[in-house]
Amino acid sequence: MSISSKFQLRSSTSLLLLVALMVVMGMDGAAAAPNTNFVSSACNTQKIPSGNPFFTNLRAMLADLKQNTAFSGFDYKTSRAGSGGAPTAYGRAICKSSISQSDCSACLSNLVGRIWGICSNAIGARVQLTDCFIQYEQHSF
C-alpha cells in the first residue's frame, strides 16, 4: 500500500468520523429541553375561593392547552364550560415557533405545574416563560 493510499484512507476515515460526530451533536441539539426560565407574570388580585367548582373547569382547560397547543400551530385558545353554575374557564397558550412540538408540550407542562406558585389561586393570570406563555381568565378574551 502506498503512502498516498494510506493518506486517503485516513482522510476518508477522519471525514467519516467528523460527519458522524456532527450528526450526533445535531441530534443532541434537537433533543434539548425547552427554555423554561421565568420572564413575567400578571396575576389577577381576586382569588378563587377554596372548593369553588371553577377549579375543576380551570384544571380541565389547562390540561387541554397543554395537550393541544403543540399540534395546533403553537397558538391555541380553548374554554371549559362551567358546570354547576361555575364560571367558564377561558385560556390561551403560545409557544415560540422556533422550538419543536415536544419542547412546546414540555414547556407548557412545566408552566402548568408552576402557575399556581406564581399566581396562587388567581381568577386570571398571564405567565410568560422564555419558550411558552399561558393566559387564563373567567371571561372571554
From Swiss-Prot:
Keyword flag Zinc-finger: no
Keywords in alphabetical order: Antibiotic, Antimicrobial, Disulfide bond, Fungicide, Lectin, Mannose-binding, Plant defense, Signal
Entry-linked CDD domains: Gnk2-like (cd23509)
Pfam hit, one: Stress-antifung
Domain Gnk2-homologous intervals: 36-141
Cleaved signal peptide residues: 1-32
Sites where the protein binds alpha-D-mannopyranose: N44, R126, E137
Database matches in InterPro entries: Cell2Cell_Antifungal, GNK2, GNK2_sf
Keyword Plastid included in the entry's annotation: no
Cysteine-cysteine disulfides: C43-C119, C95-C104, C107-C132
Entry GO MF terms: D-mannose binding
Gene Ontology biological-process annotations: defense response to bacterium; defense response to fungus; killing of cells of another organism
Function: Exerts antifungal activity through its carbohydrate-binding specificity.
The protein, known as: Antifungal protein ginkbilobin-like protein 1
Species this chain originates from: Picea glauca (White spruce)
